[in-house]
Regions:
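Catalytic-site neighborhood detector that most strongly recognizes the C-terminal catalytic loop/helix
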Residues: 24-26, 168-193
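Short, basic, alpha-helical segments at the C-terminal edge of helix-turn-helix-like DNA-binding modules
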Residues: 193-199
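Short, polar N-cap/turn motifs at the start of nucleic acid-interacting alpha helices
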Residues: 10-17, 159-179
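Acidic donor-binding helix in nucleotide-sugar-dependent glycosyltransferases
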Residues: 1-2, 163
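Ser/Thr-centric signal marking residues that sit
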Residues: 35, 149-152, 163, 175-176, ...
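Conserved tyrosine-mediated DNA breakage-rejoining catalytic core shared by Y-recombinases
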Residues: 5-74
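Short, basic (Lys/Arg/His-rich) helix/loop patches that form interaction surfaces
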Residues: 42, 60-75, 83-96, 100-166, ...
Length: 201
């Protein structure tokens, strides 16, 4: 919900930051995040900043081709809604994708790029010289799983738990430690070696 809640006004390329101040919920409503700790400013790296800058330019071109002007209030992750204006003419507006549609897109993207599979393939087609597969019974990467991976990687890289907690937006460090970080084998080996050093003194 937090990623779908981001608008361009939440992105500061000079400071290399994203402001998390709202989430887009399953009932298609923008709401404040779950807790005060969930409202946060995330530092981002140069690669993500460059990607977002390129995406903003690409999105502006996509909008212009549809007769729309990009605004700072537009979502970073967008969809289009087609309807009728007051005079009954077809109109296109910018909206946010539903969580369901985003999840479907994410699964298809992962399958098409080798990060997931469908156990029951219902359709295959070629686009731009690449085979695309659609189906049911997905297994592979899921967006929420990436949060667990990020938290675990940060702890494994010796980022302190309070900083990881703040980045995840958790009200409690115990939530981060108990549910979002996972044991890393190399760290267990290091712990054994530290114990050996301590016990030999």
């Amino acid at each position: 919900g937090e990623a779908l809640g981001l608008s361009w006004l939440d992105y500061d390329p000079e400071a290399m930051e994203l402001r998390i101040v709202r989430q887009y919920t399953s009932d298609k409503t923008l709401r404040p995040p779950k807790s005060e700790m969930s409202r946060r400013i995330l530092s981002i790296d140069k690669a993500l900043t460059e990607y977002l800058d390129k995406w903003k330019t690409m999105q502006r071109d996509i909008f212009r081709r549809r007769g729309l002007e990009q605004k700072d209030t537009d979502p970073i992750v967008h969809a289009f809604s087609v309807g009728k204006d007051a005079d009954g003419f077809r109109s296109i507006s910018v909206t946010r994708p539903s969580g369901h549609n985003y999840s479907r897109w994410f699964r298809d993207f992962c399958v098409d790029n080798g990060y997931g599979t469908y156990s029951d393939v219902t359709k295959q087609f070629m686009r731009d010289g690449k085979l695309h597969t659609r189906g049911t019974g997905y297994s592979g990467l899921v967006p929420h799983g990436l949060r667990h991976t990020a938290a675990t990687a940060l702890v494994a890289s010796n980022v302190d738990l309070k900083t990881v907690q703040a980045r995840m937006g958790h009200a409690s460090a115990s939530t981060t430690a108990n549910f979002y970080t996972h044991a890393i084998r190399a760290n267990d080996r290091n712990a054994a070696e530290v114990f050996e050093l301590l016990s030999s003194k």
